[in-house]
């Protein structure tokens, strides 16, 4: 269905664009979990994420701290709540980050609405997503009522916008949620004209 509204922040950017290649499925290999998540919590709080949101994500097994490097790991779950995707990010100043081997991009890190919702918010990273949830909380808006998906890093789109492909995470979500009629792009450094092409493809 056509998307009625596409809104970004000050700038709007087309989401992750990549050409999916058929390949044998590899089982997801999750980083070893630390028994203590204090470094991960401290890092996320230093990024301005609300402690309550961090705790809820950790309680729901969406975020944990890994060993031996104490990275923050963001988990994407399938419909049966099984881990299918993992993105790790260093808790120091090195900006170390990457995807765990076997990650399925259909299930990137997300927070789904707990009630009926026709809106979908797209973010470049899990940190951006959590920051937005925190802003909603600060405004006393219930972030549990919004669908939010991280695109796990934005790939450089083709110069020929019409040839770009919608990220599989969005395709899958829209397939399972046909009621979505508004998509909000919270992405960086983009030309507004690209949003028009993106809208047509949905």
Name each model feature, range by range.
Residues 158-160, 192-197:
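Short active-site-adjacent structural elements
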Residues 1-5, 60-62:
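Short, small/acidic-rich helices and loops at N termini and domain boundaries
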Residues 12-105, 110, 114:
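Basic, glycine-enriched DNA-binding surface that flanks or lies within the catalytic cores of DNA
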Residues 67-175:
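Phosphate-handling DNA/RNA-contact segment within nucleic-acid enzymes
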Residues 122, 181-193:
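Acidic beta-strand-to-loop metal/phosphate-binding motif
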Residues 173, 194-202:
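Short, aromatic/basic amphipathic alpha-helical patches
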């Amino acid at each position: 269905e056509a998307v009625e509204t596409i809104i970004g922040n000050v700038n709007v950017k087309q989401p992750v664009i990549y050409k999916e290649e058929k390949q044998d499925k590899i089982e997801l290999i999750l980083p070893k979990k630390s028994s203590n998540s204090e470094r991960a919590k401290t890092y996320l709080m230093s990024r301005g994420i609300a402690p309550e949101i961090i705790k809820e994500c950790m309680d729901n097994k969406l975020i944990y701290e890994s060993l031996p490097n104490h990275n923050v790991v963001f988990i994407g779950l399938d419909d049966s709540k099984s881990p299918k995707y993992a993105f790790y990010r260093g808790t120091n100043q090195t900006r170390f980050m990457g995807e765990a081997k076997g990650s399925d991009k259909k299930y990137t890190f997300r927070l789904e609405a707990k009630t009926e919702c026709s809106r979908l918010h797209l973010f470049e990273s899990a940190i951006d997503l959590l920051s937005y949830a925190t802003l909603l909380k600060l405004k006393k808006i219930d972030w549990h009522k919004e669908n939010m998906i991280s695109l796990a890093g934005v790939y450089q789109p083709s110069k020929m916008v019409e040839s770009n492909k919608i990220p599989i995470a969005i395709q899958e979500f829209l397939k399972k949620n046909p009621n979505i009629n508004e998509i909000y792009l919270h992405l960086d450094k983009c030309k507004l004209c690209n949003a028009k092409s993106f809208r047509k493809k949905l």
